[in-house]
């Protein structure tokens, strides 16, 4: 068979066949899905790709229910609060603070000027009262010590009087045992003489009547040349005690 026969047979077969245009359904669906996904990519955030359709629907419903309600802001009240706060701060800072008192562990008390003055006045009044008490106590103690010292000196003088010899200057049986030359008439009285013999009896552990009888002889006016008036007055006081003691013992 020649080449022309092959060619004629092919042409005849082609004339008998009817060609139908194929429809690619799957390919079309893929294109629609691609278009749909591309639209989703345009309108949604990339983070929403993994979300399920039901979840996205719920989120869209929730978003649709949110309503923004305008709220009226009262700005003047806020300004008033700020002003009030500012006023309080300025008044607290305007008050000048002062340190007061002694330092304790490196810190001192802090107070206002009026309070500091009040504390200072009260402290001064307390200090003055305490000083008055201290002065009174000191004077009282000083008075007691002075009295004790005077009594001790008087006791020493009394003992010395009864140990006196004839060669020593004559001292009188009076508080302080003054000498005959130094004593005055006003210092010689019955009370002072009686006090001297009472103390002498206690210190010397002797009978007061015996001591009075001894001095009644010592201070007789006939035994003294000088200071006759003083000796006479002293003898009269001693003699009066002597008569009194004798009368009481009868």
Curated annotation (Swiss-Prot):
Keywords from the UniProt entry: Isopeptide bond, Ubl conjugation
Stretch list, region Disordered: 30-67
A single Gene Ontology CC term:
cytoplasm
Query: Where does cross-link Glycyl lysine isopeptide (Lys-Gly) (interchain with G-Cter in ubiquitin) occur?
Result: 17
- Report further notes: Present with 217 molecules/cell in log phase SD medium.
Protein name, UniProt field: Uncharacterized protein YKR041W
């Amino acid at each position: 068979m020649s080449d022309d026969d092959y060619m004629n047979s092919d042409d005849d077969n082609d004339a008998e066949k009817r060609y139908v245009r194929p429809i690619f359904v799957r390919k079309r669906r893929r294109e629609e899905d691609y278009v749909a996904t591309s639209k989703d990519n345009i309108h949604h955030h990339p983070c929403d790709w993994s979300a399920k359709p039901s979840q996205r629907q719920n989120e869209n419903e929730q978003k649709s229910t949110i309503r923004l309600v305008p709220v009226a802001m009262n700005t003047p009240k806020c300004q008033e609060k700020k002003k009030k706060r500012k006023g309080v701060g300025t008044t607290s800072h305007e008050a000048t603070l002062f340190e007061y008192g002694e330092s304790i562990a490196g810190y001192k008390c802090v107070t206002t000027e009026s309070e500091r003055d009040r504390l200072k006045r009260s402290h001064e009044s307390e200090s003055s009262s305490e000083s008055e008490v201290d002065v009174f106590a000191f004077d009282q103690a000083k008075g007691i010590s002075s009295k004790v010292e005077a009594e001790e000196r008087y006791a020493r003088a009394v003992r010395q009087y009864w140990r006196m010899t004839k060669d020593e200057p004559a001292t009188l049986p009076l508080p302080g045992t003054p000498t005959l030359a130094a004593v005055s008439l006003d210092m010689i009285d019955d009370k002072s003489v009686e006090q001297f013999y009472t103390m002498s009896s206690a210190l010397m552990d002797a009978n007061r009547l015996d001591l009075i009888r001894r001095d009644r002889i010592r201070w007789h006016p006939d035994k003294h040349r000088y200071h006759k008036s003083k000796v006479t007055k002293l003898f009269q006081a001693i003699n009066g005690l002597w008569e009194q003691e004798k009368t009481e013992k009868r």
